[in-house]
Amino acid sequence: MRLCDRDIEAWLDCEKLVISPRPPIERINGATVDVRLGNQFRVFRGHTAAFIDLSGPKDEVSAALDRVMSDEIVLPEGEAFFLHPGELALAVTLESVTLPNDLVGWLDGRSSLARLGLMVHVTAHRIDPGWQGRIVLEFYNSGKLPLALRPGMLIGALSFEPLSGPAARPYNSRQDAKYRDQQGAVASRIDKD
């Protein structure tokens, strides 16, 4: 059962759930909390790679990822990031989220943005128990027009679901947690699998 707005507020009040900066009451709706777009992005560089063999040797996968992914792009205040049709980009939420070991989170895009072709997460919308950090967004523009995305705009909504008990292996306690405490638009670390 997902938390309702009253329960979300109660979990925030007792700091069992932490969202920083804390959302104002008008951004807590029914069963969700609105999140905003941060100012960090990452895109694919122009490259000549025919493919990336994701099951190849880890050092080759790592080298291929380094060739195709850009350095992190940090937008100055007031500037827009343009996502063109058919492009994939990584971004990050403005808010940082800390989940307790007995709560899982879910990220959903906004219907108003989806109706323009913007996918906010390609497939990864679960936020594991014990997560701490900003949430990376996997943007894809499936529409016909470029979209101007500005830091601070409403970009998605989080919902939360209590578990039957605390997780035995919460995210931030795992040694193999590839994105522990992420604060930026971190590229794929599939080579760490």
Curated annotation (Swiss-Prot):
Homotrimer. It comes from the Bacteria. Residues 169-193 are annotated as: Disordered. NCBIfam families: dCTP_deam. The active site is at E138. Its EC number is 3.5.4.13. InterPro entries: dCTP_deaminase, dUTPase-like_sf, dUTPase_trimeric. DCTP binds at R110, S111, S112, L113, A114, R115, D128, V136, L137, E138, Y171, K178, Q182. Catalyzes the deamination of dCTP to dUTP. GO terms for biological process: dUMP biosynthetic process; dUTP biosynthetic process; nucleobase-containing small molecule interconversion. It catalyses: dCTP + H2O + H(+) = dUTP + NH4(+). It is an enzyme of class 3 (hydrolase). It holds the Pfam family DCD. One of its GO terms (molecular function) is nucleotide binding. The lineage of its organism: Bacteria, Pseudomonadati, Pseudomonadota, Gammaproteobacteria, Enterobacterales. This is dCTP deaminase. Belongs to the dCTP deaminase family.
